[in-house]
Swiss-Prot record:
The gene is hisF2. The keyword Cell membrane does not apply. It holds the Pfam family His_biosynth. One of its GO terms (molecular function) is imidazoleglycerol-phosphate synthase activity. Belongs to the HisA/HisF family. This is Putative imidazole glycerol phosphate synthase subunit hisF2. It is found in: Cytoplasm.
Length: 272
């Protein structure tokens, strides 16, 4: 299916409050700047969507930052997905009213899977993304709860089937093992999940070079490709990413203002 549809490029801005961080194995975090600056950077470049995910909101029992979303919606000319601290339907309503196009739910879905049903019923599946953090245990992938670093006794295969049946519109699939590793996506994980659900899967976790992106679609079967750390420390990063996706013959949305053939990569995977 991936080759028939345009493959989306979606930077993921990982935050602790309004501080953007780089994440490494879900354990170590490097602060790198302000979330408003990061959003400003991406809206001026070649992306299809933006995800802003506050990873501390649920841990710290904070509500979603509606004021930030309201500001971002005025700046953003691409769809905006927001996650972090979502516990009630009112939270979702407020975020959508503030200008978010979609929300991503993680720990609330773990605690109360029926919340997915209720949210999809009220707001529509197209607004509801479920974020799934997967970690490999032996030969199977288990669900990971980042709040306390627990590996849950829940098979990811069973979980994504349930998530889909409960009305999620898409899945944001993140590999705990690959997070910050720069080793590329966990293609086996992506292939496993995309092969058993019919809703779109967004690949996340492990990108260290832009020429690694395409395997998420070609081998992993995903309809959207996301990354976090790599976009935060090099100029023209999203254009270089699209250039590599184009070179891999993926069907991507291209800007008429950009000459993609000028974006080659050096031996470290950086554009030059």
């Amino acid at each position: 299916m991936f080759h028939m549809l345009k493959i989306r490029l979606i930077p993921c801005i990982v935050t602790k409050g309004e501080l953007v961080v780089q994440s490494f194995a879900f354990k170590n975090y490097l602060p790198i700047g302000n979330v408003k600056t990061a959003i400003d950077f991406f809206v001026n470049w070649d992306v299809d969507e933006i995800i802003v995910n506050d990873i501390d909101a649920s841990k710290e029992f904070r509500e979603p930052n509606v004021d930030l979303v309201s500001w971002a919606a005025k700046e953003c000319f691409v769809p905006l997905t927001v996650g972090g601290g979502i516990k009630t339907l009112e939270h979702i309503r407020n975020l959508l009213k503030a200008g978010a196009d979609k929300v991503t739910i993680n720990t609330k879905a773990i605690d109360d899977p029926d919340f997915i049903k209720n949210a999809a019923s009220v707001f529509g599946s197209q607004c509801i993304t479920v974020s799934v953090d997967a970690i490999k245990q032996g030969n199977v992938y288990k669900l990971y709860d980042y709040r306390d670093g627990r590996v849950l006794d829940v098979d990811v295969v069973d979980w994504v089937r349930k998530v889909e049946s409960y009305g999620a519109g898409e899945i944001l699939l993140n590999s705990v093992d690959r997070d910050g590793s720069r080793e590329g996506y966990d293609v086996e994980l992506l292939k496993t999940v995309s092969g058993i659900v019919s809703i779109p899967v967004i690949a996340l976790g492990g990108i260290g070079r832009f020429d690694q992106l395409a395997e998420g679609a070609i081998e992993g079967g995903c309809q959207a490709l996301s990354a976090a750390n790599i976009f935060q420390h090099m100029e023209h990063s999203t254009i270089a990413a699209k250039a590599q996706m184009r070179n891999a013959k993926l069907n991507v949305r291209l800007s008429s203002k950009v000459k993609y053939e000028n974006f080659d990569l050096d031996f470290l995977g950086r554009p030059y």
